[in-house]
C-alpha cells in the first residue's frame, strides 16, 4: 500500500540556489542521513548531484536534483522547463505489488532504457497518465 509522500523532487541549476530557498528562506534542514555532504549524492546514469532536505519533522523530504552537464535528462528538463517541480515520490510497504496495481489502474510504467530513470530500484510512472506529474514509488524506509 502507498503509505505517504516520501519526497518531492525539484530541479535547480545549482545547489546554492536550492540551499538558499530551502534552508535559508524556508528554514528547513539538510537530511544528513540521506545526503553525502558536502558534495551531495552522485547519480551516475543521470550525471546528477542529489541533496535531501528535511521538511519539518522529517517524514517528507525535498530531493534537490542538480545536473552536472548539459545533456542528461535532468539537464534537458532544466533547459526546457526551468527550475522547479520534477516529480513526486510515494513510499510503499509493498513496492512491486503497488507498481503492478498502479499499472493495472492505468498508469504507464517507465521501462529500463527510457532516459535517466532506473525503474529496477524505484519504479517511475509517465506523466501523461498521472495529470502531467512524473511519479516515483520507493520502499517505505520509515522516518529517515
Annotate each PLM feature.
Residues 29-57, 126:
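N-terminal strand-loop-strand beta-hairpin
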Residues 5-13, 52-60, 66, 69, 75-144, ...:
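Vicinal oxygen chelate
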Residues 29-30, 60-61, 72-73, 130-133:
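Short loop/beta submotifs within extracellular cysteine-rich repeat domains
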Residues 32-37, 73-79:
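Short, tandemly repeated low-complexity microdomains enriched for cysteine and small residues
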Residues 27-40, 104-114:
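Short secondary-structure junctions
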Residues 18-23, 102:
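Conserved active-site tyrosine of GNAT-family acetyltransferases
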Amino acid at each position: 500500500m502507498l503509505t505517504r509522500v516520501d519526497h518531492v523532487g525539484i530541479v535547480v541549476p545549482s545547489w546554492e540556489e536550492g540551499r538558499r530557498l530551502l534552508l535559508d528562506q524556508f528554514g528547513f534542514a539538510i537530511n544528513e542521513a540521506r545526503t553525502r555532504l558536502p558534495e551531495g549524492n552522485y547519480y551516475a546514469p543521470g550525471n546528477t548531484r542529489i541533496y535531501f532536505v528535511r521538511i519539518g519533522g522529517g517524514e517528507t523530504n525535498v530531493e534537490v536534483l542538480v545536473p552536472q552537464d548539459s545533456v542528461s535528462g535532468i539537464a534537458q528538463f532544466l533547459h526546457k522547463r526551468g527550475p522547479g517541480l520534477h516529480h513526486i515520490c510515494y513510499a510503499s510497504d509493498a513496492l512491486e505489488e503497488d507498481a503492478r496495481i498502479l499499472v493495472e489502474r492505468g498508469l504507464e510504467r517507465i521501462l529500463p532504457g527510457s532516459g535517466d530513470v532506473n525503474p529496477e530500484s524505484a519504479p517511475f510512472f509517465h506523466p501523461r497518465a498521472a495529470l502531467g506529474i512524473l511519479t516515483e514509488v520507493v520502499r517505505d524506509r520509515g522516518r529517515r
